[in-house]
Structure formats: structure tokens, C-alpha cells
């Protein structure tokens, strides 16, 4: 009987511990190594955004390197996820400017329905954080769309 109880407790504990593994919801770790490599290096501009931004560097990586540009786009990200990682992927790099392209995945409801005023608030918060830290903001407009598939 003791063995059954101990075995049951062990199985229960294993399930409980595995259920508590943290999920990297905002993909904080995506650029961890690259950010560490930039410590102390001058950064002119950080590009913060979604898949569109994520793919810009692929067009001409040398252009980014030559000009002190850093790409911190992550495909599929919403403004809430970008805001969550804004300190790590923008402010901590101490750029002169940040280019923000955000909101399209909120409209596509990648994380479920969201009110437009919340999307706006997330974008305003990123802008406020940047300005507070002496970083100029370039805010891009959303691309036009009428449906998502």
C-alpha cells in the first residue's frame, strides 16, 4: 500500500512540475545571444516589429551591420508581446532611434480578440518608454488589409 501511495505521489508531483514549466510567451530569449554580443557596441537604430520587420534583415544583412541597425522583429507578434520585450530588445541596446511597425497581428487576432484602444495603448507605451530613455521614435503605419486567412 505504501508503494502505491508513494508511486501515486511521485506521478502527481511529476505532472505538477511539468505543468509549471514557463512558456516564453513574448519570446524573450529569441535575441538573447545577439543582445549580449552587442553589449557596449554603438547601435544607431533598432527595428521592432512583426514578420515584416523580422524579414527586413534577410534582404541585405550587410546593410544592417554597416549602419549600426539591429532587427528585432518576431513573426506573428502582437503589440502586447512587443511591449513585454521592449526593454530587453530596444532600451537595453541604447539606440539613438527605434522604428516600430506593430498592430497587424492584433488585428488578425493572433492572441484572440483585443480592443483597438488596447492596441493603441501598447503602441503608445512603447513610444513613451523610448522617449523616456532618450530614444527617438519612428512609428510606421499598418499595411492595408481586409481579411486574414
Question: Which residue stretches match the model-derived regions?
Answer:
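Serine-esterase "nucleophile elbow" of acetyl-processing enzymes
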Residues: 19-99
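Alpha-helical cap/lid subdomain in secreted, periplasmic
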Residues: 61-68, 81-149
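Bacterial Sec-dependent N-terminal signal peptides
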Residues: 1-20
Amino acid at each position: 500500500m505504501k508503494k502505491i501511495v508513494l508511486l501515486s505521489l511521485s506521478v502527481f508531483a511529476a505532472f505538477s512540475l511539468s505543468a509549471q514549466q514557463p512558456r516564453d510567451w513574448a519570446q524573450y530569449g529569441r535575441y538573447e545571444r545577439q543582445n549580449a554580443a552587442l553589449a557596449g557596441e554603438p547601435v544607431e537604430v533598432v527595428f521592432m516589429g512583426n514578420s515584416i520587420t523580422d524579414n527586413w534583415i534577410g534582404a541585405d544583412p550587410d546593410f544592417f551591420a554597416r549602419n549600426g541597425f539591429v532587427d528585432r522583429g518576431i513573426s506573428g507578434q502582437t503589440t502586447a508581446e512587443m511591449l513585454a520585450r521592449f526593454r530587453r530588445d530596444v532600451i537595453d541596446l541604447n539606440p539613438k532611434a527605434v522604428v516600430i511597425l506593430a498592430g497587424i497581428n492584433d488585428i488578425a487576432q493572433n492572441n484572440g480578440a483585443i480592443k483597438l484602444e488596447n492596441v493603441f495603448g501598447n503602441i503608445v507605451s512603447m513610444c513613451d518608454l523610448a522617449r523616456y530613455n532618450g530614444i527617438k521614435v519612428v512609428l510606421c503605419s499598418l499595411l492595408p488589409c481586409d481579411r486574414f486567412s
